[in-house]
């Protein structure tokens, strides 16, 4: 901020002080704002964009790269139809940018047959409702999972050993039998509350 301000020289004679004040009034105060720079640009009449203190001239867009050549006849017909569609899109006008890479693509993305569980459930857009049972479909055998719930006797036998171990650890630590709800002789003295 200091470089935009000028100090007035204080001299005994009134003439020097007045000259300094007149000089300050003639110079623009403050920073150049966007409005001031636009007004200066209109007065100067230049064909450029002014960003901060640099001038940037707008260049025309680069020409599109030439299309690639293909060896097959099918690719040549695909190029011809792509060129016709490109001409049709260009004729509408506007600033639409054509994606040449997308037009030159001649393969489709597919899901591998090993990842499809049931190929009969997948329908392609525009296909009929008739199912085609061709040998080209990959049949993946999925294992059949049955939810077998063990009997309650098996569950009791499975958890009984761990429950017994936890019960014995509690009895040893607190000298209290939680199953029978009675204190046992040991290091703690149990008192029944009212």
Curated annotation (Swiss-Prot):
Residues 49-58 have a biased composition (Basic and acidic residues). This is Cyclin-dependent kinase inhibitor 4. Residues 49-70, 107-139 are annotated as: Disordered. One of its GO terms (biological process) is regulation of cell cycle. GO terms for molecular function: cyclin-dependent protein serine/threonine kinase inhibitor activity. Keywords: Protein kinase inhibitor. It comes from the Eukaryota. Induction: Down-regulated by cytokinin. GO terms for cellular component: nucleus. InterPro entries: CDI_dom, CDI_dom_sf, KRP. Belongs to the CDI family. ICK/KRP subfamily. Gene3D superfamilies: p27 (4.10.365.10). Pfam families: CDI (PF02234).
């Amino acid at each position: 901020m200091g470089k935009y301000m000028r100090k007035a020289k204080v001299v005994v004679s009134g003439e020097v002080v007045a000259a300094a004040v007149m000089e300050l009034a003639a110079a623009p105060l403050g920073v150049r704002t966007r409005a001031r720079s636009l007004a200066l640009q209109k007065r100067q009449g230049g064909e450029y964009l002014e960003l901060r203190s640099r001038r940037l001239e707008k260049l025309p867009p680069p020409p599109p790269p030439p299309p690639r050549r293909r060896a097959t006849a099918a690719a040549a017909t695909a190029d011809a139809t792509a060129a016709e569609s490109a001409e049709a899109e260009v004729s509408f006008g506007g600033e639409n940018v054509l994606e040449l890479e997308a037009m030159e693509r001649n393969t489709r993305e597919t899901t591998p047959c090993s990842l499809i569980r049931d190929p009969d459930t997948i329908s392609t857009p525009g296909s009929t409702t008739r199912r085609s049972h061709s040998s080209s479909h990959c049949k993946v055998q999925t294992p059949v999972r049955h939810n077998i719930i063990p009997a309650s006797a098996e569950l009791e036998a499975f958890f009984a050993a761990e429950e017994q171990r936890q019960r014995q650890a509690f009895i040893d630590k607190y000298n209290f039998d939680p199953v029978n709800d009675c204190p046992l002789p040991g290091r703690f003295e149990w008192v029944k509350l009212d």
